[in-house]
Amino acid sequence: MGDIPVEEAPFPLTDVDKWVLSQTDEEFKKHGWEELKEIIATNKLEVLKRKPSDLRRYMKWTAETKAEYGSMTKFLLTNRLPKPWGEPPFSPKSTVPFEDPSDYRVLVNDWPYGLDPGITHIVVWSRTIIPTDPETGDMTVESRRTVQDFIDRYFVKTLGDVGEDRVVWFKNWVALQSVRALGAYPRAGARRRPGSHQEVV
């Protein structure tokens, strides 16, 4: 199977995606750490982009995966998320997000954005619903505080005094999620290792 034509994309392409697909990998500028922090601080998540060749591979893989499993949700439930979770709607052990470790799963993102070397994109899936604003699709103030508390506990504190400067996180708005059936669940952030090494968490 060759490249997927834009008009046959297996998920809605944003204007940024279409622009990226018009580029070569050599023309593409990866997101650096400072730019990434600015994007997340201003909540302009729509500008996050994959490398052109990665986006083409992601489109192809998504089409093949949907053909094999019927949906991305089925693939994730079969291969990436804990079997005890079952099928959505899930029945979490706690109604408080991230309170019970069996209610979330931390994974390296299989299809990260185009990031500078040393930055790793990690996704946190939660079977406990994290409330969003029905009008904007963004997190509520309380949800943002809940996620921040988890990020601090799970990622920042493990890095000691330098942790706060080395971790950023975000949650895609509903409109930007490629797996809508599990749309309430993915959480992502970023971590920078000591020295010049950086990671996205």
Spans of features found by a protein language model:
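HIT superfamily nucleotide-processing domains
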Residues: 1-201
